[in-house]
Amino acid sequence: MALAVEKTSSGREYKVKDMSQADFGRLEIELAEVEMPGLMACRTEFGPSQPFKGAKITGSLHMTIQTAVLIETLTALGAEVRWCSCNIFSTQDHAAAAIARDSAAVFAWKGETLQEYWWCTERALDWGAGGGPDLIVDDGGDATLLIHEGVKAEEEYEKNGTIPDPTSTDNPEFQLVLGLIRDSLKVDPKRYHKMKTRLVGVSEETTTGVKRLYQMQATGTLLFPAINVNDSVTKSKFDNLYGCRHSLPDGLMRATDVMIAGKVGVVCGYGDVGKGCALALKAAGARVIVTEIDPICALQALMEGFQILTLEDVVSEADIFVTTTGNKDIIMVDHMRKMKNNAIVCNIGHFDNEIDMLGLENYPGVKRITIKPQTDRFVFPETNTGIIVLAEGRLMKLGCATGHPSFVMSCSFTNQVIAQLELWNERASGKYEKKVYVLPKHLDEKVAALHLGKLGAKLTKLSKDQADYISVPVEGPYKPAHYRY
C-alpha cells in the first residue's frame, strides 16, 4: 500500500495525520498529567533508577492524550517505545503529533482504514534487524494476535511450503492479517519467530483481549507470559464502570445532541461496563432496560431498579441501544429493521462485531446518509424510516468523543506500568511461564492509594490489635484474593 514512514529531525520514525497539532497536544498532555497522579508517582519513584533502560516496548492502545502520559512515563523510566492505536477511530491526532515529535515512534491517526490500521500495527512491532519488542502493552490483543498468527504461518511454511491465503476466510479484517503475514514470509520467513523469541511478555488492558489470552492458555498456544491488567480491581471496577458512566453520555451527546431524559435506553450486558452505562442513562433521566444471559448479573440489575427483558421484547420500544457484552451478533439487522425512526444504535465494547454492520450495510436498498464523521443514518426502503449508528458499530466513546477522563485512566495505566515493570524485572527469574497472571493484591491497593490524595482522602489506620483481630497486616493487603469488591 502507498504509505511511507516519515522521520523527525532527530531520526525518529512516525506516521500521523498532522504534526502541526503537536503544540496543542502538548498543552493537553500537561493538563492531563495533573489529573494522573498514579503515573506521575511512578515517574518519581522509578525514574531515577531507569528500570526500563534497554527495553523496547511496543504499544497497541488508543493513542489519546491519556495514553500520551503513559507513553512518556515508560520513556521517563528508560524505555524505547513504538506505538499504534488499537482502533481505527480512537486516535486523538494532536496527542499522536505531540508524542511523535517529542517522545516515541507513533503510527496512528483518526479515521484509518482497516488496511492502514494493520500497517500501523506492523510498524509498531517493527524494531528493525534486531527483531521485535521486548514487551507489549496491548488493548484488545491485536498485536498479540498478529505475532501468534505469524508464528503459526511460519511453521506451516517451514513444514510444507504453505503460504497464507487471504481468500481462505470470509472475515475481511482477517484477510488483511493473512495478507500482511504472507508478504512478511517473502521477506523474512522467520520474522515472527524472532519476535516470539525476544518477547518477555505482554500486559493486556481490556476484557476482550484478556478473553483471547485465556483461550490461548487453555489450548496451550500462548507463546509468552501475559499479565491481565483488566482484572486488577483498580482497572475493572473503576475504568470499566466509572469511565463508561462518564463516556457513554458524552459520546451520545457529542454525536447526536439527543436529550436522554425521558427516553428508553437498552443496555445489552450488565458487566462492569454495562453497569456504568446503565447508571449513566438512569442519571440522565432515561428509563433503562437491561438484557442479560447471566442470572447473577440480571439479579444485580433488578436490585438497582432496572428491568430485565430480551432485546426482542423492547426492540420497537426503545430510543437508545448500547452493546457492552464483548460478544458477537448482539444487535442484528432484523432487530434494526424493527426499531423506531431515528433510534440510536451504538457499541461501547472493544470490537465491531456486537452490531451486525455487515448485514446492515448489505441490506437490499438500504440508504446510508453520513450526518458527520462517525454519525450515520441508515434508511430502510420498505418503511423510509431509519436508525442512527455511531462510530460504524465500533467503540463509540472514542469514535464520537474522547473516551474516559484522565483520572480514571491513571488508575488503569498505573497498573500497566507496574505490570510492565514486573515482567521486565523478572525476565530472567523464571517466575512467569507462558500463562496469564494478575497483579497481586498489595499492588492493586498501592495503585488505589496513589490516587487518594488527589481527591482529598485520608485513610483510617488500623492498630496492631485491630489488624491481628481480623488477621491482616497493618499496612495491608486488607482483602483476600477472592474478595469481589
From Swiss-Prot:
Protein residues bound to NAD(+): 206-208, 240, 269-274, 292, 327, 348-350
GO molecular function: adenosylhomocysteinase activity
Enzyme class at the top of the EC tree: hydrolase
Pathway, per record: Amino-acid biosynthesis; L-homocysteine biosynthesis; L-homocysteine from S-adenosyl-L-homocysteine: step 1/1
Keywords: Hydrolase, NAD, One-carbon metabolism
Entry note: cofactor: Binds 1 NAD(+) per subunit.
EC number: 3.13.2.1
GO biological process, alphabetically ordered: one-carbon metabolic process; S-adenosylmethionine cycle
NCBIfam families recorded: ahcY, PRK05476.2-3
Family: Belongs to the adenosylhomocysteinase family.
Protein name: Adenosylhomocysteinase
Organism this protein belongs to: Mesembryanthemum crystallinum (Common ice plant)
Lineage of source species: Eukaryota, Viridiplantae, Streptophyta, Embryophyta, Tracheophyta
Gene transcribed to yield this protein: SAHH
